[in-house]
Regions:
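Conserved NAD(P)+-binding/catalytic subdomain of aldehyde/semialdehyde dehydrogenases
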Residues: 173-263
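Flexible, glycine/charged-enriched surface loops at secondary-structure junctions
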Residues: 98-103, 225, 262-267, 287-297, ...
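C-terminal core of ALDH-fold dehydrogenases
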Residues: 317-430
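A glycine- and small/hydrophobic-rich beta-loop-beta segment
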Residues: 258, 266-337, 341
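Short acidic-hydrophobic, aromatic-tinged amphipathic segments that line or gate anion-handling sites
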Residues: 1-7, 178-183, 303-308
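Conserved small-residue-rich beta-alpha loop and adjacent elements
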Residues: 103-169
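N-terminal Rossmann-like NAD(P)+-binding subdomain of aldehyde/semialdehyde dehydrogenases
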Residues: 1-119
Length: 430
C-alpha cells in the first residue's frame, strides 16, 4: 500500500495512473482468430475452444437437457438469492422506461421520439475461477425488458465441456434465447460474423480479459456495437472519521480480489482513518481465499490524505472511478458534486458488493477513466432512439422558406427543390 500525503494537483495524473499493458501482440492474435472464424465458422470455433479451453465440443449450443440438469444442481438457497436480485434489477430497469416524446414544433409540424429495441444482442459471460452469473442478470434482464427478440449468450466451457450451472440457470431464468459453449476471442468473433451455430448480433455486451476486450474493439470495425471500452476493475472510497475502518477495508478488498491489475484507492481527510484502514486490510486479507490475487492489487493501492473535502472532490472528478463509495459526514456534498463516476454508493451500510449483486443498479460500468464520458449499462443500452416527423401542408408552408434559404446557402439545390416543388403544388392547388 502506498500512502500519499497532500499531493499537489499537478501530480494527480501520475499518482492516479491506471495499470496499463501493451496490446500489440494481443491484437495480432485477435485478428488471426477473427479471420479464421470469419472464413471457417464453427470449425474455427471448435479449434480454438480445444486450444484455449482444453476441451473438444461436439455441439456448441447448450441443449435443453443440459439446462434442466443445471437447474436441478443449483441450490435452493442460491436460486432464492438470484430471484431477489433479479426482482430488484427488474424494478430499477423497468423504471427507466421513457414515454414517447411528442412536440408540435410549429403549427403543422409534429415531431416525436420513440425507443425501439436492438433486435439481436450478444452477451459474453466469463467462466473460470469466478463464473459471473450475476452479469447474466445485469445484461439479460434489461435486454428482455427492452424487448430484444434475440439474446445470445456465450460462455467458455470447463474441461468437461460444461458451462457453470449457475450461469445456465440465470440465463434460462432471464429469457436468454440461445446459450453457446464458446469463450474468448472466438466467441466475440463468432457473434461478430455469425457461424453455423452462433448467430450474428448487432451489439455485444459483457466483461472479459484483455483478449476479449481487444476482440470487442475489433468487432466494432465490422459494424457491431459494444457496450463500452473495458479495463480492470477499480474502486475509489472517500472517507472521514465517521467511516467504519473495517467496512472501508472490506470494500477495498472486494475490488482487489477481482484481479492483480484491479485498482483501489482511499481518499481521506483523516490520517487516523488511513492508518486504521491499512491495519484492517492486513487482518482481513489473511482469511480471503483469493488473497494471492488481492495482495498483488493491494500492493499497488493508494491511501491518499488531503486537507479538505473540496480538494478530495476535485481529485475524485479528475480520476473518474468505476465505483465510488462515500463514507463521509458530508455525503450530500460529494453525491451532488461528483460528475465522473460509474456508480455511487453512499453511507456506511452501502457496500459496493450490493451494486454488484442485488441492489438493482447495473454493475456493468465504465472503467479506465471512461466514466468521464460513458454511462454504465442501463435500459437505453439495449435500445435506439428513433425520431419521426409528420408535416401537413400548413406545416411545410411554415418552415419551407427557411429550408429553401438554408439549402441554397449550403449549395444543396436538390434539397431546396424538394421543398420548392411542394410549396408550388400547394400554391397551384388553391
Amino acid at each position: 500500500m502506498n500512502k500519499i500525503y497532500n499531493p499537489k494537483s499537478d501530480t494527480w495524473t501520475s499518482i492516479l495512473e491506471r495499470p496499463t499493458k501493451t496490446v500489440d501482440d494481443i491484437e495480432a492474435t485477435v485478428k488471426e482468430i477473427f479471420n479464421e472464424v470469419q472464413k471457417k465458422g464453427d470449425t474455427a470455433v471448435a479449434k480454438y475452444t480445444s486450444l484455449f479451453d482444453g476441451v473438444k465440443i461436439e455441439t456448441i449450443e447448450v441443449s435443453k437437457a443440459e439446462i434442466a440438469l443445471a437447474i436441478a444442481s443449483v441450490s435452493i438457497e442460491l436460486k432464492e438469492a438470484i430471484s431477489l436480485a433479479k426482482s430488484n434489477i427488474t424494478k430499477f430497469h423497468i423504471a427507466q422506461k421513457t414515454e414517447r416524446i411528442e412536440v408540435e414544433t410549429i403549427e403543422g409540424v409534429k415531431c416525436w421520439q420513440e425507443k425501439r429495441p436492438i433486435q439481436k444482442i450478444g452477451l459474453y459471460i466469463p467462466g473460470g475461477t469466478a463464473p459471473l452469473f450475476s452479469t447474466v442478470l445485469m445484461l439479460a434482464v434489461p435486454a428482455e425488458i427492452a424487448g430484444c427478440n434475440e439474446i445470445v449468450l456465450c460462455s467458455p466451457p470447463d474441461k468437461n465441456g460444461i458451462i457453470n450451472p449457475a450461469i445456465l440457470y440465470a440465463a434460462n431464468l432471464c429469457g436468454v434465447t440461445k446459450i453457446l459453449k464458446v469463450g474468448g476471442i472466438q466467441a466475440i468473433a463468432a457473434m461478430t460474423f455469425g457461424t453455423q451455430s452462433v448467430p450474428k448480433v448487432y451489439k455485444i455486451f459483457g466483461p472479459g480479459n484483455q483478449f476479449v476486450t481487444v476482440a470487442k474493439q475489433l468487432a466494432t470495425q465490422f459494424g457491431v456495437a459494444i457496450d463500452m471500452p473495458a479495463g480492470p476493475s477499480e474502486l475509489l472510497i472517500v472517507a472521514d472519521d465517521t467511516a467504519v475502518p473495517a467496512f472501508v477495508a472490506s470494500d477495498l478488498l472486494s475490488q482487489a480480489e477481482h484481479g492483480a491489475d484491479s485498482q483501489v484507492i482511499l481518499v481521506s481527510t483523516s490520517k487516523k482513518l488511513i492508518d486504521a484502514v491499512e491495519n484492517e486490510i492486513q487482518i482481513q486479507l489473511e482469511v480471503l481465499p483469493r488473497r494471492a490475487i488481492a495482495k498483488k492489487s493491494i500492493a499497488n493501492s493508494k491511501l491518499i490524505f488531503v486537507e479538505n473535502d473540496t480538494i478530495a472532490l476535485e481529485l475524485i472528478n479528475e480520476y473518474g472511478p468505476e465505483h465510488f463509495i462515500i463514507c463521509s459526514e458530508f455525503d450530500d456534498f460529494y453525491s451532488n458534486g461528483v460528475y465522473n463516476a460509474g456508480s455511487v454508493f453512499i453511507g456506511n451500510y452501502t457496500p459496493e458488493s450490493a451494486g454488484d449483486y442485488a441492489s438493482g443498479t447495473n454493475h456493468t460500468l465504465p472503467t479506465n477513466g471512461y466514466a468521464k464520458n460513458y454511462s454504465g449499462v442501463n435500459l437505453d443500452s439495449f435500445t435506439k432512439a428513433m425520431t419521426f416527423q409528420k408535416i401537413s401542408q400548413k406545416g411545410i408552408q411554415n418552415i419551407g422558406k427557411a429550408i429553401e434559404i438554408m439549402a441554397e446557402a449550403e449549395g444543396l439545390h436538390a434539397h431546396k427543390n424538394a421543398v420548392t416543388l411542394r410549396l408550388n403544388a400547394i400554391e397551384n392547388g388553391k
